[in-house]
Design a protein with these regions (language model features):
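Bacterial Sec-dependent N-terminal signal peptides
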Residues: 1-22
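Alpha-helical structural elements
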Residues: 6-9, 30, 42, 345, ...
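Conserved acidic, small-residue-rich alpha-beta core segments centered on
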Residues: 134, 299-479, 493
Length: 497
């Protein structure tokens, strides 16, 4: 699985007329009850980061919010709040298709891309109104801290992680603002110029969705973060950058669909040649592994790559389990097939696969069969020098599983920023999607609860992303110069050895 939620929210549309159509209290309560029961029966990660008491508490809050008819968008925000609270980056919640076929009309979007730099909201676009690099303190009298907190629910991350939400905010700020606060034709912005303390006020005009998208494509930081938001063409690369240092870059693990796929086999051949070269050139004592743009992908690319970095046997998981063998609430399930008979066959095939991989019931959990989690061996040409692992908030799913193994089971010096994917585990692999009966909101989550095969470490905190040994973030000066701060830091660290 991989985290690819940016495009969902960059392009989520909604019809202004539909906002005025309200769901009755009965319909709202029925949908929320169905939603709650689905999570309890099917979602093995429901209590991974939250206790039952905490989970019951947020549902009590949710039910208290629907004592009168509500517009679909308002109910959607309640559901988002719950799915974000659960703490899984594979949780996706989408509006009905008729909300996704047309965009809001008019010049109602905040015009300029922004980016979080050193926890400050910075203008990320050259323009004549609010200069590039300016810090934003408030918009329409809403303080930045309040703005950002209200946007967190739109972009889920593992556990209690906050750093990963910066990816969603930078990619979808204008969409989040419209969704949260409604259409605005004017924006009163309180800001300061780069490296200045004086606060200024400027009223700027909203733009159309088309201009918003065009401005994002032309953002200042594009040379640095293009791979975090666009289609990845160059998925991996290897090069020798100094006589004693090589760089392995893996921008995604979406490299073929399975172990037999030609694209995966080509990747395997590439890794073989790279590490055979390193094995034959022992003067290369340093390997930089850059996975900062890696939002995940497919098995077995992540664990195959790790085999070239370790000297000891390893597994993908310490434990994996699901809550069910027969899909709960099949009437609300979203099927790929459209004909009832084929839907029945689709469900039965899915359930047979679940029963094969998770056959044994122990303490209310269906445990993964060991044959699906074999003990794996290091490659004969695995690297034996010093590893430097570059990480960022973008790393998720299979990307964070790989990074956690490299962090916990190699000599890697981990450099960069906390990932959105967890160190100790996550819910992943197998997604299911349901549609609520009245609102037609779709909710997707992954059903396999994974505990990753990593040791406990003092600096790795349960419920957080992978925390670097050396936190290195872009400064405002680096941002303005589009400087690759983490990479340059790593090269200097190697030079000082």
């Amino acid at each position: 699985m991989f985290k690819s939620k940016i495009m969902l929210f960059v392009f989520i549309p909604f019809l202004m007329a539909a906002q005025n159509q309200k769901l009755s209290v009965y319909e709202l309560k029925q949908d929320l009850t169905v939603f709650k029961e689905i999570r309890e029966k099917a979602n093995s990660g429901l209590y991974k980061y939250r206790t039952k008491q905490q989970t019951d508490s947020i549902y009590s809050w949710a039910f208290s919010q629907i004592n009168e008819p509500k517009a679909l968008l308002d109910f959607y925000k309640i559901i988002l709040k719950i799915t974000d609270f659960e703490g899984s980056l594979h949780n996706d919640t989408t509006l009905p298709e008729n909300f996704q076929n047309k965009f809001s009309s008019g010049n109602v979007f905040f015009p300029y891309p922004v980016k979080l730099i050193e926890d400050k909201l910075i203008v990320n676009f050259r323009n004549t109104e609010i200069p590039l690099g300016s810090e934003i303190f408030s918009i329409n009298k809403i303080k930045t801290k309040e703005l950002l907190a209200s946007f967190y629910k739109y972009y889920t991350t593992d556990g209690y992680n906050i750093s990963g939400k910066s990816i969603g905010i930078a990619g979808s700020f204008a969409r989040y603002f419209e969704m949260e606060y409604g259409s605005q034709k004017k924006f009163l912005v309180e800001y300061s110029l780069p490296d200045k303390s004086q606060k200024l006020l400027k009223t700027i005009t909203g733009v159309s969705n088309e201009i918003r998208k065009e401005n994002f494509k032309n953002r200042h930081s594009l040379p640095i973060d293009s791979l975090q938001y666009g289609k990845i063409k160059n998925k991996y690369s290897f090069k020798v950058i100094t006589p004693n240092t090589s760089l392995l870059t893996i921008n995604t693990f979406a490299i073929g669909n399975n172990a037999e796929d030609k694209e995966h086999l080509a990747y395997k051949k590439h890794l073989d040649s790279c590490f055979q070269y390193l094995s034959n050139n022992l003067q290369i004592k340093n390997l930089i592994v850059d996975v900062r743009n890696n939002g995940g992908g497919t098995d077995p690319n992540d664990i195959l790559t790790f085999s070239y970095l370790t000297q000891k046997p390893y597994r993908e998981n310490a434990e994996a389990y699901v809550n069910f063998q027969e899909i709960p609430f099949p009437n609300y399930l979203v099927y790929e097939e459209t004909e009832p008979q084929k839907q029945h066959e689709e469900r039965k095939d899915f359930e047979e696969e679940i029963k094969e991989e998770f056959p044994k019931l122990e303490n209310g959990k269906y445990i993964q069969d060991e044959k699906f989690n074999a003990l794996l061996q290091p490659d004969k040409n695995s690297f034996k020098g010093q590893i430097y692992l570059l990480i960022s908030p973008r790393i998720a799913s299979a990307g964070s599983l790989f990074a956690s193994l490299a962090t916990g089971r190699t000599n890697a010096i981990v450099i960069g920023e906390e990932t959105m994917g967890g160190y100790y585990g996550h819910n992943g692999h197998t997604p299911v999607e349901y549609e609520l009966p009245n609102s037609k909101i779709k909710t997707q989550f992954s059903i396999v609860n994974l505990e990753q095969d990593v040791p406990k470490k003092a600096n790795q905190i349960f419920g957080r992303g992978i925390i670097p040994d050396r936190e290195v973030r872009q400064t405002l000066e680096d941002f303005l110069k589009n400087k690759d701060t983490q990479f340059e830091y790593t090269l200097k660290l190697i030079e000082q050895k």
